[in-house]
Amino acid sequence: MNEVATQGLVAVAGATGRVGSVIVEGLSDAGAAVRSLSRTPSDPDTAGARSTSRHIDYADAGSIASAVDGASVLVISLGSSDDQARQEIALIDAAVHAGVEHVVKVSSWAWPSRMHPIDWHLQIEDHLSKVDIGYSLLRPMTFSAVIGAQANLIKNDLWGGAAGTLPANLIDVRDVADVATRLILSGAASGPVRRPYHLTGPGGLSMDAIAEHLSLAIGRTVKYTHRTPDEQRALLLSLGLPDMIVGLLLGIDVEAFASGASTETTSTVEAVLGRPPRSIPDWITESAGLFR
């Protein structure tokens, strides 16, 4: 990032997560004042004179209020869980009460759905729209890292699902984080402005095409086995995955991939960053070690 940070304190909720950790790193490297918020208790000292960390207890209203107090911008990037909507709404309400000027919410490529976590994100977005605070909504396509979550299945020749044959335009989590960081450092994510940003990769690939790229990257044949939703559910449950995770994975397959909802391409990442987003083959090449 080339900007020199001039805004006030940025509080980052979900600071140890896949997106949040990269945001914290980017802001800290640019000299921004950052407060990293995490459920994991930690010392108040972190690397960087303008960066601190703080434990946040989402069951304690006082802890939430203290976490956002004094911040100009609040980044919300929590992981998917049954408590996600409650926790993020509590953060938003605390931010409004504390006088935080702007929320950067890492959401999802959303459409009306009962599928988790899309319905949770929509609930949070609806609440955010009704309170008096500026916001930047980052709505990314499914992350490329969803392939990495299948690493054990790929290693054991069990990879497959109900994703169908349409291309999925997955996005690298680093691009999502880089967009958030650039918006904050440039001042675009500040004050009362309210704007969504729809984020995708540079172009989609089908699961069969992704399998071909995996094969080239690791030097052995990888196949994607097409299954019905019921067959995929039975397999995942037999492997001991929790019901919620099984539901998330099946929902992505059926509602995001097979439906064609993940085929779109936007120019938003390049417009914000001045460079194209990382491609799925790029991610596979960098992450090949996960699948060997």
Walk through the language-model features, giving the residues of each.
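Oxidoreductase cofactor-interface core, primarily capturing Rossmann-like NAD(P)-dependent enzymes
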Residues: 2-49, 56-65, 69-71, 80-89, ...
